[in-house]
Amino acid sequence: VPVKWLSMIGKKEKKPVADRPNIDYTIYEEGIYVGYRDFDSHRKEVAYPFGYGLSYTSFRYSPPVVRMESDRIIVQCRISNDGARAGREVVQVYACAPEGMADKPYQELKGFAKTPRIGPGESCEIQIIIPMDRLSSYVPGTGWVVDPGEYTLRIGSSSRNIQQEIRLPGIPGLILPPDGRLP
């Protein structure tokens, strides 16, 4: 599921159109706390977490192996089908960033990969490449910044079903060019 809903939705507030200043444009007043970033950061109960999906089988994640390069992080993990039926799994990698120059949500999706069909008792290796610039946040007056410090990668099948975590100490701080991309 690419979006999340709160478990209990109250009555929708109705306002006349005249009270809305953004008829011809959009004002994003919520900042970075949209969807799962808001729900996960503020520990709100949800009916369906971001990334949620059903399967007729169950999967087990081995501890990940992470390789850091100057411009990217490579995450490898073995996914095993522990159930009685064949199936596929969407493996998602979320990052928890250190405190820095910009306000940040609890975690953000940084990469994902779908396994091939895995039979019962079988497993496969997946690899997810996360470009280093995906760790950046926009800081007004400065630009796109990767804050230095320890990041935690959380690996699972949804934002709330985390199977493995790994800490990455010593991520160097970077200020990216105006386009937000590493050269």
Enumerate the language-model features and the residues they cover:
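Short, hydrophobic/aromatic beta-strand segments
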Residues: 86-93, 105, 139-140
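Intrinsically disordered, low-complexity Pro/Gly/Ser/Thr-rich segments with frequent PxxP/GP/PP motifs
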Residues: 101-138
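Short glycine/proline/serine/threonine-rich loop/turn segments at secondary-structure transition edges
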Residues: 134-150
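Generic detection of short hydrophobic beta-strand segments and adjacent strand-loop junctions
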Residues: 116, 126-130, 164-174
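Secreted, periplasmic, or luminal enzymes acting at the cell surface/secretory milieu
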Residues: 1-88, 94-98, 120, 147-156, ...
